[in-house]
Amino acid sequence: MSLLTEVETYVLSIVPSGPLKAEIAQRLEDVFAGKNTDLEALMEWLKTRPILSPLTKGILGFVFTLTVPSERGLQRRRFVQNALNGNGDPNNMDRAVKLYRKLKREITFHGAKEIALSYSAGALASCMGLIYNRMGAVTTEVAFGLVCATCEQIADSQHRSHRQMVATTNPLIRHENRMVLASTTAKAMEQMAGSSEQAAEAMEIASQARQMVQAMRAIGTHPSSSAGLKDDLLENLQTYQKRMGVQVQRFK
């Protein structure tokens, strides 16, 4: 796996799924391929994206700034600086300075990542802030190691939170989660079916499923009524899998 592929993988792991994730992936690919060289326009686009947390925007802004060649005097962006200040916690800043001193002696991506993984996400973000604000300089490889370690820390906590939700025994949360998954699956299938002339029936099934979820939410239903909802939807859509040329199993 190449260095840039690894960076793209880690960064995308902290971006919520949806159309915006596909857009960000495309921009990262363009930046890494040297196709997008307008850093100012890129940062303005990033600043106005909805859904993304300030920290995710800060990390993406840091990656774009590292990768896109720019004039030395180009202004640093406030939204990135604010995201990478470690929540203003002096402890984070102290740890970030210690980490920076270690990274300064490191030259490899993997070496930097290993060192950084023993620090908290707050300290890692503060260290990125030091480098972004030109208070410290490290090689691009080392900076990317720092980025990937930060993303790994964030993705780990997101995964723990997701696992807790999936494992919950609370019937109301399970019920709502099944309806959200069914609705999301239907929406994705509608988008994919849109490019196929023969997928009108699949579109209809997906649309009916979404209407059913809306109705269940509107009238309030028993927590067990959503059991199997997503699986039923997938079974129906399976019929049109060959016509649509889509691997529906991936949604399971």
Swiss-Prot record:
Keywords: Host nucleus, Membrane, RNA-binding, Viral matrix protein, Virion. SMART domains: Flu_M1_C. GO terms for cellular component: host cell nucleus; membrane; virion membrane. Coiled coil: none annotated. One of its GO terms (molecular function) is RNA binding. Pfam families: Flu_M1, Flu_M1_C. A motif (Nuclear localization signal) lies at residues 101-105. Residues 1-164 are annotated as: Membrane-binding. It comes from the Viruses. It is a peripheral membrane protein. GO terms for biological process: viral budding from plasma membrane. It is found in: Virion membrane; Host nucleus. Homodimer and homomultimer. Interacts with NEP. Binds ribonucleocapsid by both interacting with genomic RNA and NP protein. May interact with HA and NA. Cannot bind NP without genomic RNA. Belongs to the influenza viruses Matrix protein M1 family. Plays critical roles in virus replication, from virus entry and uncoating to assembly and budding of the virus particle. M1 binding to ribonucleocapsids (RNPs) in nucleus seems to inhibit viral transcription. Interaction of viral NEP with M1-RNP is thought to promote nuclear export of the complex, which is targeted to the virion assembly site at the apical plasma membrane in polarized epithelial cells. Interactions with NA and HA may bring M1, a non-raft-associated protein, into lipid rafts. Forms a continuous shell on the inner side of the lipid bilayer in virion, where it binds the RNP. Determines the virion's shape: spherical or filamentous. Clinical isolates of influenza are characterized by the presence of significant proportion of filamentous virions, whereas after multiple passage on eggs or cell culture, virions have only spherical morphology. Filamentous virions are thought to be important to infect neighboring cells, and spherical virions more suited to spread through aerosol between hosts organisms. This is Matrix protein 1.
